[in-house]
Amino acid sequence: MMQRSWQSWRRGLTLGLASRRSYVASVEAPSTPPEELDAFERDYLKQRIEITPFQKLLLGAGSSIASLLDPHRHDMIACLGETTGESALWNILDSMQATEEGRRILKDKPRINTKTIDFKRLEALPPNTFGATYAKFLKDNKVTPDSRMEVRFLEDPKLAYIMTRYRECHDLVHAALDMPTNMLCEVAVKWVEALNTGLPMCYGAAVFGAVRLRPRQRREYLKRYLPWAIENGKGMRPLMPIYWEQRWEQNIHELRCELGIKPLQ
């Protein structure tokens, strides 16, 4: 009954939001003059869905409930990240602007997908490089960088890019941490990301994801994975200012040492 009620509520809200797409063009212009916007920002403002504070509250509450009922609802998890993460995204923006590498990312706005990355080149790199490690991670876990949801609800295009960057770098973080995509490792990675980025969505996924672990997994999680994730999340360098695409040929062990990543014992 609760599932049916949620689906009905979501359909109504989605229709209401979709009807507002035409409104986006008529809202007041962004603080940055249109001619000064880059390609990502222009494209984002065309597809952004404008929402009121009340709709944002409803989306945040509804998506959190839906994510708890079904952790595989990636659309709801993405929605939760956008409606609850604005403050953390501003902090991430500050951390990226504070480093030369982070500023280059904000200027270039690179994207990570099969159209922008030459994966055959990565596969041909020596096996001890970060690029080869990432390519092997994707192949071993049968995942693709093209599966990430587009950002829709954030008002500021700068924050929209940072959220996009976070999503597209998630698998890179998995590879750097040497964590596959099973439930236990996914929860551990979410703890690392939560402590490293401050995104509320990551905290929620880490806490409630752990609840769904099987008894044997939970014992292993509490004994090894959680302490490891907390130590790394607190001790690592900020990950969002890392220009991963310019580190494909870097030795993976040297990269982990540079970032402060400690291996799982």
UniProtKB/Swiss-Prot annotation:
GO cellular component terms listed in the entry, alphabetical order: extrinsic component of mitochondrial inner membrane
Function in brief: Lyase that catalyzes the C1-decarboxylation of 4-hydroxy-3-methoxy-5-(all-trans-polyprenyl)benzoic acid into 2-methoxy-6-(all-trans-polyprenyl)phenol during ubiquinone biosynthesis.
EC supergroup of this enzyme: lyase
EC number: 4.1.1.130
PANTHER family referenced in this protein's UniProt entry, alphabetically: UBIQUINONE BIOSYNTHESIS PROTEIN, UBIQUINONE BIOSYNTHESIS PROTEIN COQ4 HOMOLOG, MITOCHONDRIAL
Membrane association type: Peripheral membrane protein
Binding site for Zn(2+): H170, D171, H174, E186
Keyword Transit peptide on entry: yes
Principal location class: mitochondrion
Catalysis: reaction(s): a 4-hydroxy-3-methoxy-5-(all-trans-polyprenyl)benzoate + H(+) = a 2-methoxy-6-(all-trans-polyprenyl)phenol + CO2
Keyword terms: Lyase, Membrane, Metal-binding, Mitochondrion, Mitochondrion inner membrane, Transit peptide, Ubiquinone biosynthesis, Zinc
Pfam families assigned to the protein according to its UniProt record, in alphabetical order: Coq4
Location(s) in or outside the cell: Mitochondrion inner membrane
Cofactor: Zn(2+)
Pathway connected to this protein: Cofactor biosynthesis; ubiquinone biosynthesis
Taxonomy, superkingdom: Eukaryota
Organism of origin: Drosophila virilis (Fruit fly)
Transit peptide (residue range): 1-30
Family: Belongs to the COQ4 family.
UniProt protein name: Ubiquinone biosynthesis protein COQ4 homolog, mitochondrial
UniProt keyword annotation of Metal-binding present: yes
Subunit relationships: Component of a multi-subunit COQ enzyme complex.
